[in-house]
Design a protein with these regions (language model features):
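Active-site catalytic pocket residues across diverse enzymes, especially alpha/beta-hydrolases
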Residues: 4, 27, 115-119
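Active-site/ligand-binding loops adjacent to catalytic centers
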Residues: 5-9, 13-100, 144-177
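Extended hydrophobic-aromatic, low-complexity segments
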Residues: 79-80, 99-103, 123-124, 139-140
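Catalytic phosphate/nucleotide-handling subdomain of diverse soluble enzymes
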Residues: 107-174
Length: 177
């Protein structure tokens, strides 16, 4: 049927913000398992990228039904965009659509632009691009903003009991206030 033909043609194309690209590296290596990523380097790389939401150290990549399986099932591809590419794409979107977008959307748009330029997208392809964060700059124009610091920062490998105790203490504190 026509509906099943459309479904068969769907291809998942995802991106990461360089230099924080652990899923991209695993995908390029053909690995379901995330590759080793030294903690200090991972932290440093995550600090460099604009799209902080793309800096998950333990994403649902290799789990059954996770991103690896979804990419495999759709013949998908993984792309990388630098901060400069993403900023350029965000600027282009604002010029063409009149609204600002989040950094992660800029990474996705930059990857799409690069994929089109490289001939990886057919000219008659139907493309769905997930764009988030439209209008934040406009929203902030006449608002007073407060930048809050976290109440607690856990180590990379926290003790489960410590996490539970700290979270319970946060809720107890908020309830008492």
């Amino acid at each position: 049927s026509a509906a099943s033909d459309v479904y068969k043609r769907q291809k998942l194309m995802v991106s990461q913000n360089a230099p924080f690209v652990p899923m991209y590296d695993a995908w390029q290596a053909g690995s379901r398992k995330m590759l080793a990523y030294e903690d200090d380097k991972a932290r440093r790389d995550a600090e460099i990228i604009d799209a902080k939401v793309l800096s998950n150290r333990r994403p649902p990549y290799g789990i059954t039904g996770g991103l690896y399986d979804a990419l495999k099932a759709t013949g998908g591809e993984f792309f990388v965009a630098t901060n400069a590419m993403a900023r350029k794409a965000r600027k282009l979107f604002k010029e063409l659509e009149g609204v600002d977008i989040y950094s992660a959307s800029g990474v996705a748009l930059a990857s799409l632009v690069n994929a089109v330029a490289a001939g990886k997208i057919e000219k008659d392809a139907v493309v769905m691009l997930n764009i988030t964060g439209g209008g934040e700059e406009h929203f902030k124009e006449d608002k007073e903003l407060w930048y809050l610091k976290p109440s607690h920062v856990f180590p990379l490998e926290p003790d489960t009991d410590d996490v539970v105790a700290k979270v319970e203490a946060l809720f107890a504190k908020n309830i008492a206030e």
